[in-house]
Amino acid sequence: LTPQGWMKDGSVLISDGKILEVTNSDLAVIGAKVVDAKGMSIVPGFVAMNIHGGGGFDFSECTEEAFHGAVAAHQKHGATTIFPTVLAPEIGVIDKAVTVCEEMMRKKDGPILGLHIEGPYLNPKMAASLFIDKENPADPKEYKEILERTDCIKRWDSSPEIPGALEFAQYLKSRGILSAISHTEAEFD
């Protein structure tokens, strides 16, 4: 698959893990290892942006073992870039996730580019499956304390009807973090 669409037959030249050339013809490179991919598809790596775990592991466990296990499961199926989604019924879960994520992001060429947080500023009527059973107003002291010491959070979901959620979204935007609406009773209007 190329930006121009599907290519029926052709060759891909890879050196040191980088694609050097994609062509409709056969490539003859002296000393190159040839992999016959007839009947297969070659596609760019997948970006997993809302992924809670995999391979029997849950990112919300907030352990290196869970992160490694889930990442390995997704890499096996073509994900090259992963934004682990962590369900956070309370702010302490985010602290743990940040610690593990920062460690994983220190690894050169690692697949994790940042965290996606769901909670705790969600409508409890719409987030019961996340173990959020009470309204948690978006507390600037709480979220600023976390965001001022890390840059690994790339997306943070909240329900706009929660007190303080609009200010929270504006703060996220000011820091270059994607603010997403989630688990809400809000309507389009």
Question: Which residues are covered by each model-predicted region?
Answer:
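Divalent metal-dependent hydrolysis catalytic cores, especially in the metallo-beta-lactamase
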Residues: H52, H68-A97, P111-N123, T150-E161, ...
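Generic structural signal for well-ordered alpha-helices
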Residues: V71, D95-E102, Y143, A169
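Histidine/acidic residue-rich metal-binding segments in metalloenzymes
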Residues: N136-D189
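Active-site mouth loops of central-metabolism enzymes
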Residues: G53-E65, A128-N136, L178-A180
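Divalent metal-coordination and catalytic microenvironments
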Residues: V12, G17, G39, N50, ...
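Short helix-capping segments at alpha-helix termini
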Residues: M105-G110, S174-G176
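N-terminal metal-binding scaffold of metallo-dependent hydrolase/deaminase domains
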Residues: L1-A28
